[in-house]
């Protein structure tokens, strides 16, 4: 993992693995922390490894105030495009679709939903109910409905009784305290790193399946809905019965691929602190 700083504006790119193309996200705010960017890059590396792609996760931060954001994001996009590193980036927090020029990978909510719902059903084939947090968009609701799942309305989704809980509001949204309050059978991330390391252990103890975000959110990396459903279902099917839970099982699966072409595995698994 290394940080490459831009010279044209106050921005940086966290790059997990060197000398390979990569995918990731760009976020913009007055101050983007490098630690969070590194965590996001690692999660994408594991997603790509899960798909057996020799690529790296990347995550960019553009530090800019509202009055200077337009110039900052334009300068960043122009500079990174000139690096000719093969990076493709989606618009994250503070960045609007269409602002990244030739770097941009369009955000595809339908592909995200396809993979996430497929993951949930692979882990819990008899699921009939689902609850979603406030980040759920129309695409996820449509995908759930198309698969015959009933949506549970709840003031607090984390404590709602349902087969599947879809959550992606923020990194670390489910800590160990929240994990002990969960009433769902399966937690399906729809965003990066929503479950902390301690929460994973508490979920295992409580009999809740915590699925790997780097698999459940990988649909957009595949470019086609049916391919996303098939691949995500297959991966979750491989790891759902792992002795240490599906998240650690998916980590081991990704690491087995990484070990086939890297001299040393990246240090640290993709989980929120």
For the regions a protein language model found, what residue spans apply to each?
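N-terminal ligand-binding/catalytic initiation module
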Residues: 1-108
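Adenosine-phosphate binding glycine-rich loop
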Residues: 26, 185-273
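Flexible, glycine/charged-enriched surface loops at secondary-structure junctions
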Residues: 48-55, 86-92, 127-129, 152-154, ...
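Glycine-rich phosphate/diphosphate-binding loop of Rossmann-like nucleotide-binding domains
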Residues: 107-166
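A general structural motif
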Residues: 165-172, 190-194
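Rossmann-fold NAD(P) dinucleotide-binding segment
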Residues: 171-187
């Amino acid at each position: 993992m290394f940080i490459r700083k831009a010279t044209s504006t106050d921005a940086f790119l966290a790059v997990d693995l060197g000398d390979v193309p990569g995918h990731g996200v760009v976020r913009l705010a007055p101050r983007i922390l490098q630690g969070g960017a590194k965590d996001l890059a690692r999660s994408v590396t594991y997603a790509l490894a899960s798909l057996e792609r020799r690529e790296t996760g990347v995550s960019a931060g553009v530090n800019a105030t509202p009055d200077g954001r337009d110039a900052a994001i334009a300068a960043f996009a122009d500079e990174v495009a000139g690096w000719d590193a093969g990076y493709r980036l989606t618009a994250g927090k503070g960045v609007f679709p269409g602002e990244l020029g030739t770097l941009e990978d369009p955000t595809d909510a339908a592909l995200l939903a396809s993979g996430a719902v497929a993951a949930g059903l692979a882990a819990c084939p008899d699921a009939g109910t689902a609850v979603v947090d406030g980040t759920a968009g129309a695409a996820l609701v449509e995908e759930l409905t198309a698969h015959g799942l009933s949506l549970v309305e709840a003031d607090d989704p984390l404590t709602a009784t349902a087969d599947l809980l879809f959550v992606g509001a923020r990194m670390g949204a489910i800590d160990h305290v929240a994990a002990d309050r969960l009433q769902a059978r399966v937690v399906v991330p729809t965003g990066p790193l929503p479950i902390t390391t301690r929460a994973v252990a508490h979920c295992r103890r409580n009999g809740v399946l915590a699925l790997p975000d780097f698999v459940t959110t990988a649909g957009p990396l595949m470019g086609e809905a049916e391919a996303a459903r098939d691949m995500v279902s297959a991966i979750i099917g491989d790891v759902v019965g792992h002795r240490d839970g599906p998240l650690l099982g998916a980590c081991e699966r990704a690491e087995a691929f990484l070990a086939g072409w890297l001299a040393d595995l990246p240090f640290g698994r993709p989980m929120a602190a």
